[in-house]
């Protein structure tokens, strides 16, 4: 199975060799669609520019897809039996499976980034990771705050013992103060500028639904697990699931556990190695590999061909 990262994996310098290898995907056509220089933002930054939600999302989608396309070429006849992506990464997974074409995906992801940034700007908000905390405890903590009039929800189910909550700024301050006494081993604020995957993103859902309305979805060449349901998405429901995703919890750990029933290896494709770490924590007895540049793509492709052969 192939796994694609989401927002937070962006780093200045990512994809440097891909900009040389794949100008068809990362060159002027992408810049014209986005209205800004993908190469400049990815390679020159600064990091504060690349971290902006409306920049990070299309940049990560483009670089991860270009890397996937090179990796797929190196794989030859070998093909994944499944795919998933964390949040934004679900779009990369769908493009990799041929459900949407690359430039359509890039357009929708750019609109998604703008819509989520706009929603976040309406109210100071953010996210925090709870470590050493199961889903039941995380939901209880969020419910305690909501029962007291607050705005706090479970946003990511990343791995056993790793949950993420999203909420308004004052609710996150409350969480940092009271999280430990309510059952979390540690509470860590995340460097994101919004309460993603929570009801505070409702306006982004509405905008995204409009953007997705014109998107034609094709049959996937391999199944893609949806964040909202933690099961393979059907073509007829792809647009609805993607619209709902921005204000629904990312059930990534559940997806990995479900996929592990039918796959024996996970391959992270894209900048960083976040989904590989989550796969190691969420499954056991499965090989986990990382493709985050062209050299690792060549090594992993050769290894997988030998294993399959």
Language-model segments: which ranges?
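Gly/Ser-rich oxyanion-binding loop with an adjacent helix/lid
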Residues: 57-129
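Alpha/beta catalytic cores of group-transfer enzymes, especially the acyltransferase/condensing modules
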Residues: 7-9, 34-36, 97-249
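Short glycine-aspartate micro-motif
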Residues: 1, 83-85, 105, 154, ...
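Short beta-strand scaffold positions
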Residues: 62, 85, 166-167, 268
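Acyltransferase/transacylase module recognition
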Residues: 1-74, 79-80, 213-309
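A short small-residue
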Residues: 43-50, 92-93, 186-190
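Catalytic nucleophile loop
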Residues: 6, 83-92, 197, 270
